[in-house]
Every structure is written in C-alpha cells, then in structure tokens.
Curated annotation (Swiss-Prot):
Sequence similarity: Belongs to the universal ribosomal protein uL10 family.
Record-annotated membrane-spanning stretches: none
NCBIfam families: PRK00099.1-1
Organism of this sequence: Pseudomonas syringae pv. tomato (strain ATCC BAA-871 / DC3000)
Subunit structure: Part of the ribosomal stalk of the 50S ribosomal subunit. The N-terminus interacts with L11 and the large rRNA to form the base of the stalk. The C-terminus forms an elongated spine to which L12 dimers bind in a sequential fashion forming a multimeric L10(L12)X complex.
One biological process term in Gene Ontology: translation
GO molecular function, one term: large ribosomal subunit rRNA binding
Signal peptide: none
Reported function: Forms part of the ribosomal stalk, playing a central role in the interaction of the ribosome with GTP-bound translation factors.
Keywords: Ribonucleoprotein, Ribosomal protein, RNA-binding, rRNA-binding
One GO cellular component term: large ribosomal subunit
InterPro entries tied to this protein: Ribosomal_uL10 (IPR001790), Ribosomal_uL10-like_sf (IPR043141), Ribosomal_uL10_bac (IPR022973), Ribosomal_uL10_bac_type (IPR047865), Ribosomal_uL10_CS_bac (IPR002363)
Protein name (database record): Large ribosomal subunit protein uL10
C-alpha cells in the first residue's frame, strides 16, 4: 500500500522527535509475532516510557539521519520495529529482551546508546543498567556500609583505650 508524501513526512517527523528525545534505541525484527503479542508489547512499552513503532526502512533512515542513532542504519533491513527509551536508557532493551524470551520469532537486531552501536549479543550491557532509583540505593548501601565499618572501628579503638587505662 502506497503512503502519501504528507503521511511519510509526518512519520519521519514523529520518529525524528522520538529519536531526539530518546536515550537509547533498540531495533528488532518482529516478523511472525502475533497481533495480540505485539499489542501486549506496545502496552508494556507505554507503561515503561518506551516509544515503539514499526517504520519503513527508508523513512527510518531519514528520521534518524541527524541523531546519535544513525549508527543503526545498517540494520534497517526487512521488517523493522524500533524502540526509543525516553526515561531510562535500558528500558527498551529490557522490554525487548523479556519479550523475546516468550517469542521464538522475535529477533533483536541491534541497539544504540550514546552514539555507539551495540550488536544483538551486547544488548545485555544496556538491559542490565540499573535505573536511577536502583543506582541511588546501591550507592547509599555502599556509603552506609563504609560508615558502619568506620563507627565499629572507632568504637573498638575507644574500648581498647578504656581497657588499657583501667
């Protein structure tokens, strides 16, 4: 089905805006995935703050041409599903990775983060990034552990001096 020129321009503009706002992008081939499964994926994506769209490759290349995601141009072949993470860099990668576990025909092609190309086998790097809240809690536990150790050391020194004075 042919798309009118105005519609093509609108699609390119919409995807370009999503790309400029996105923190990372993940590209997949969803050929053979059922409509119901794709609807579920889109619902999960909305909840996770991820923009998901199936776009023609030529339009996608134009949309990401002036963004950090232009490194993905070589993987824009065949049916292309692209996802941009808007709130957390690893959100789209986590979403696609989880979805791929239940779908044999769903294939993650590649990802891009901060202008760097990540092959399909490197998606775990992006998917395992902690969220902001997780990173803060990890940092706080490290600080709390160091503080507790310092307090115990000072208490032991104090007890040692008291024992020596007595």
């Amino acid at each position: 089905m042919a798309i009118k020129l105005e519609d093509k321009k609108a699609i390119v503009a919409e995807v370009n805006e999503a790309a400029k706002a996105g923190l990372s992008a993940v590209v997949a081939d969803a050929r053979g995935v059922t409509v119901g499964a794709m609807t579920g994926l889109r619902k999960e994506a909305r909840e996770a703050g991820v923009y998901v769209r199936v776009v023609r490759n030529t339009l996608l290349k134009r949309a990401v041409a002036d963004t950090e995601f232009s490194v993905l141009n070589d993987v824009f072949t065949g049916p292309t599903l692209i996802a941009f993470s808007n709130e957390h860099p690893g959100a789209a990668a986590r979403l696609f990775k989880e979805f791929a576990k239940g779908q044999d025909k769903f294939e993650i092609k590649a990802a891009a983060f901060e202008g760097k190309f990540l092959a399909a086998n490197q998606i775990d790097v992006l998917a395992t990034l902690p969220t902001r809240n997780e990173a803060i809690s990890q940092l706080m536990s490290v600080i709390q552990g160091a503080t507790s150790k310092l307090a115990r050391t000072l208490a032991a020194v104090r007890d040692q001096k008291e024992a020596a004075a007595a």
